[in-house]
Amino acid sequence: MRSWSAPKVPKLPGSGLPLRLYDTATREVRETEPSGKARMYVCGITPYDATHLGHANTYLAFDLVNRAWRDAGHDVHYTQNTTDVDDPLLERAQAIGVDWRELADREIELFRTDMEALRILPPRDYVAVTEVIDDIAEVIVRLMERGATYRIGDDVYFSVAAAPKFGAISGYDEETMRRLFAERGGDPGRAGKRNPLDWLLWRGERPGEPSWESPFGRGRPGWHVECTAIALRHLGPGFDVSGGGSDLIFPHHEMGACEGHVATGEWPFARAYVHAGMVAYEGEKMSKSRGNLVFVSELRHEADPMAIRLALLARHYRSDWEWTPDRLTEAEARLARWRAAVARPAGPDGAALLARVRERIADDLDAPGALALIDAWAAADGDDASAPGLVRDMVDALLGVAL
């Protein structure tokens, strides 16, 4: 599937530092150690509504990872999916009276436009689930061959008993797992399951639902195995970062990691699991089900997309925080100050600022710390004639903000 257009990224002098990120699985900030090529998979949207600021916050976080790796000299292989067949999409399409494919195509195109406006570097592989049904079925066959599955009618389930590493990503206790599984699309109470936490790999054909042929009958894939199959196809096991919002820690990333482990025999499925915090609005997490969304497509018609980007960068990527209009006002003022500063004929030492900003970004993407350093530079005087141009390029290359 077509990705979106890539902005030009300035080449900075010198080289970026090794990137350290908080790994959910080990509960510590540790160095990412890509061997030449850096491989990253970030879970994409289910395209049944427009991109909201919660989405933007997540994809901006991993855009910083992408940029930091590139600055350090790595060739980045970034893969992202879009879940273009799933229950919420089918339900929304039926509710508004359109074909589910039409709805998905429309929202995917809007997502592309939003990502371009925010200057998010595009993935090398932008993959729709409906493009890789055969690959997904192949992974399920491998799980079957390893005795990790069972059937309930025409549906195929993964057995938690076959996953020795289950729980290694989240570290959650069983009570928490059951609660989150029920809240996030699981079916712990379904009759016939061997364990309430067993999860769906393949949903047998239902009347009025899209379906595809497979070695185990017509149907469509479950959510978790979709990302497992796409990551294996494009990146292989042991890729550097698996990313998404913190609401994907469980069940999605936990279950996907187990599928990858059992299917390949290799652990870890990803070398680090990195998660962005949740954005709230009007007192609750921003989500489609709650209807408290701030859409990027609407906001960027009211404000410079670079101000939106700066508003998101002002909070550490792992933080949970609440959006208010004041945050955009503050970001617009910051953007104006920075643009005025790089328009000067000279400024304080640009090379020293670059070194310090690189340190902040390398330390678990401390974007707020980087912003504070640039604020101080913009407020000071200096006689380095090369500084304004260097700072303009630095802000573009590392933070993705065009001045």
UniProtKB/Swiss-Prot annotation:
Binds 1 zinc ion per subunit. Gene3D superfamilies: Anticodon-binding domain of a subclass of class I aminoacyl-tRNA synthetases, HUPs. A motif ('HIGH' region) lies at residues 45-55. L-cysteinyl-5'-AMP binds at residues 43-46, 58, 81-83, 223, 245-247, 279. Disulfide bonds: none annotated. Its cofactor is Zn(2+). Zn(2+) binds at residues 43, 227, 252. One of its GO terms (cellular component) is cytosol. It catalyses: 1D-myo-inositol 2-amino-2-deoxy-alpha-D-glucopyranoside + L-cysteine + ATP = 1D-myo-inositol 2-(L-cysteinylamino)-2-deoxy-alpha-D-glucopyranoside + AMP + diphosphate + H(+). The keyword Ribosomal protein does not apply. GO terms for biological process: cysteinyl-tRNA aminoacylation; mycothiol biosynthetic process. Pfam families: tRNA-synt_1e. It comes from the Bacteria. GO terms for molecular function: ATP binding; cysteine-glucosaminylinositol ligase activity; cysteine-tRNA ligase activity; zinc ion binding. A motif ('KMSKS' region) lies at residues 285-289. Belongs to the class-I aminoacyl-tRNA synthetase family. MshC subfamily. Monomer. This is L-cysteine:1D-myo-inositol 2-amino-2-deoxy-alpha-D-glucopyranoside ligase. The lineage of its organism: Bacteria, Bacillati, Actinomycetota, Actinomycetes, Streptosporangiales.
